[in-house]
């Protein structure tokens, strides 16, 4: 391998190292609220302790009408239980809020007594997070004539919401309007919300149906720039994402009474909040135009998303019904893809944060997912995926390793050219290029597989980091969560000594690495030894340290990523060794290892 080739490899490795350091040392800063920002006011003029309901649908709403915003305790409100294979919780009859929801199949940690993940919480609980439906008044109606956040509903039918038994809620306004809300749920995470209004009067009534998802206070987020957390929406084919700190910078919209972004959707769309693994989304019927709203209510510190359907006219003596959906659950690829296909929810699969390299992350995840279903072990699936990637890149790798072998054959001639050129670098470069051209050798060909590995590495990193299928995915022995760092540590001899490993994220955990990062460093070091050390002393020193620097830098990354990197190094080693031997160059692995431990004499460095 000549100096140009080594310089390119070194530059690539160092650039990769800089990116890793940036990942570790420079996460985004916590958002800071501007103390000089204008105070937001609710439509009622009071502090809003519950979601800010939409304004009147049209300007001719009854004078003095105001949405319900005053807080009402929910802990004593009657409830209807939710009981499905995937979900458990309850619906508060106060406002008909879906505000108590937990995910049966997901625990917070791997501990045996770990509680299941709670997704939604009522207003009087820490981190309140809930879905709310209602009607905004239009025409001659006031907010007292329509159900809102604090309306007390009664159960018309259904004692428990299950997959087979929907629940019907009922409320009469006392002025001839009867409102019903039918809630149904499937085996996974999709609710169907059907709102109807029966007009028993003789005059037409007008009102606008809406749905709201509200979060009180900024939730605990990972706050890492490779992951989106916050508003996620689809607007007629365009994906819209806003972090929580972005919402603080929305323009103040007078009609909304808050900082808000309002989008008019013509045919297909949805909006909600996404976390790393969980999501809540309001989904109008595909083909239905609606208004999509994301807002931040500053004086109450409430983040919310809304969908507002077109204003409905309910003729006297008739009933009008509208249907929407609510997704509330885990971002499982199979479930989300199924909803996109079966329900026609455009772009729903893009609610998973595939990142800039989506053209790589999507197929990589698909193959990894299918392999895991086939094999039944995510760690083994990652190794098989690595084999498939290396097989796909084999034609390029073959050419590059053949080129490297040819470079070895030309080494004696290159040394002669160096002697002839002396200190004339320009003359040497010209002579080298003529030699390469004559022998049909590309000196940079050896770097191509390395360059291709960078986007693949970051795509796999993205897949492991953001997809829920890797969460708590076991490999073997102590490796029970491939989305988490290696739990073993050299400090207690990988579990042989009777004391715990360092706390993850601590300085000790960075120093006393686990067995997987150690194997990574060794595999990189052995791969280097297929070639003699560079003649340039500076290059030789950097190359000597590079495997061990990567070992410590990658030690805090997800263990699934380290498994991939180790497998990649081992396969690359085998490929390179076999191809180079086949083309006449026999790597002196043992000799290069021995030479790396010998101390050079000063004369050898000159």
Curated annotation (Swiss-Prot):
One cellular component term from this protein's GO annotations in UniProt: plasma membrane
Residue span of region Disordered: 59-79
Entry-linked Gene3D superfamilies: 2.70.98.90
GO biological process: protein insertion into membrane; protein transport
Organism domain of life: Bacteria
Entry-linked NCBIfam families: PRK01318.1-4, yidC_nterm, yidC_oxa1_cterm
Quaternary structure (record): Interacts with the Sec translocase complex via SecD. Specifically interacts with transmembrane segments of nascent integral membrane proteins during membrane integration.
Name of the molecule in the record: Membrane protein insertase YidC
Taxonomic source organism: Dinoroseobacter shibae (strain DSM 16493 / NCIMB 14021 / DFL 12)
Classification of source organism: Bacteria, Pseudomonadati, Pseudomonadota, Alphaproteobacteria, Rhodobacterales
Gene: yidC
